[in-house]
């Protein structure tokens, strides 16, 4: 169970780093929000899911 928690936290950190870089790039691109909003929504949905997963796994470990 601990390894699953550690992998979930690592995935959350990686996803956060990717979103930190990609969201400003999406808004600065010529297509802007209209062309890339599906990518932003997918990344945000993944991030929210990982936050809940880390919270659930943390409650099971503690």
Curated annotation (Swiss-Prot):
Which top-rank group of organisms is this from? Eukaryota
One GO CC term, this protein: chloroplast thylakoid membrane
Question: Per UniProt, which keywords does this protein have?
Answer: Chloroplast, Membrane, Photosynthesis, Photosystem II, Plastid, Reaction center, Thylakoid, Transmembrane, Transmembrane helix
Family of this protein: Belongs to the PsbZ family.
Purpose of the protein? May control the interaction of photosystem II (PSII) cores with the light-harvesting antenna, regulates electron flow through the 2 photosystem reaction centers. PSII is a light-driven water plastoquinone oxidoreductase, using light energy to abstract electrons from H(2)O, generating a proton gradient subsequently used for ATP formation.
Q: How does it assemble?
A: PSII is composed of 1 copy each of membrane proteins PsbA, PsbB, PsbC, PsbD, PsbE, PsbF, PsbH, PsbI, PsbJ, PsbK, PsbL, PsbM, PsbT, PsbY, PsbZ, Psb30/Ycf12, at least 3 peripheral proteins of the oxygen-evolving complex and a large number of cofactors. It forms dimeric complexes.
Protein name, as recorded: Photosystem II reaction center protein Z
UniProt gene name: psbZ
